[in-house]
Amino acid sequence: MLFERATVFTVITLAVVILILDLPWLFISSKWAGDMIRDIQGSALVLNPIPAIVVYLALGFLATIPTTPVESFGLGAATYAVYDFTNLAILKKYQPLFALADTFWGGVLFTLVFYVRSFFSI
């Protein structure tokens, strides 16, 4: 069942939807995250586009799984929590408040994607 919903077209479409919906958070949090990354690695954050594309495709695949808004929020929060709390566990200067905010955003983002997916029958 899962792979029937996760066609290549669906995954790519949802990856684009996620990127578009993620842009406001990326913009809003850019100074906060940028300053934190600079503190951690000693240089400015530089986007490497190929891994970024892989991440959004993986998120697009994950977004095919939930069947309710609550499941969507849970999966999004869990997905972002894995990233954020792994960073918090291993990076000395990763900020707990950022980890919480980004984890919450993951839940909100996946819930928004669920509604877009439902509205457009993606």
For the regions a language model picked out, list residue spans one by one.
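Juxtamembrane/disordered regions of integral membrane proteins
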Residues: 2-122
